[in-house]
Amino acid sequence: MGFTSYSGPASAFPGKGTWKDFDTIFNLNKPEMLQTGDSGEDVGRIYNAVKEAAKEVGVEERVIFCIIMQESTGNVGVGTTIDPGSHPTGGLMQAEKSPAFPGQHNLSQEQISSMVTAGTKHFKANLKQLDDQDTATTIYRALRLYNSGSIDESNLSDGQGATPSYVSDIANRLQGRTN
């Protein structure tokens, strides 16, 4: 199933009722994660790390995992990049101040969890900048902040120097679509 393009305000994006459950989304993406060089153990540890971070930080598992897939394709050894504000962003969620292990695989649970927790805390801070509600519209708005650091409420596909399709791509991933 191909990606559908969404744009406009958060209300124009698909509601939570269209989102697949975490296990379904995770299992649909396993083949893609394994193609990055991740071991089966790495993939299992990503699953555990998402569950842990969701419980510890208070962000939905499926949102955390879809950010991981959008940012790094689940590659535990993904390289560090530079965000629009010229800050290094690393790890599975490409978050500022996240631990990163470029080029490495077969990581420990602690290493993988550290990346997922750092990114999840960063996203939670974006949620708190808004109304910290567990609604699709707040999550979509926070995703725009996570990716670009700012938000045009009238058009979440205005990347303002970052990836324009970021929120739309994650909306698709939440519905079970893969690359």
Q: Where are the regions a protein language model picked out?
A:
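Non-catalytic cell-wall polysaccharide-engagement segments
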Residues: 1-44, 55-57, 98-179
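Aromatic/hydrophobic pocket-lining residues that form π-stacking "cages" and hydrophobic walls in ligand
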Residues: 50
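Glycine-rich His-Gly loop
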Residues: 72
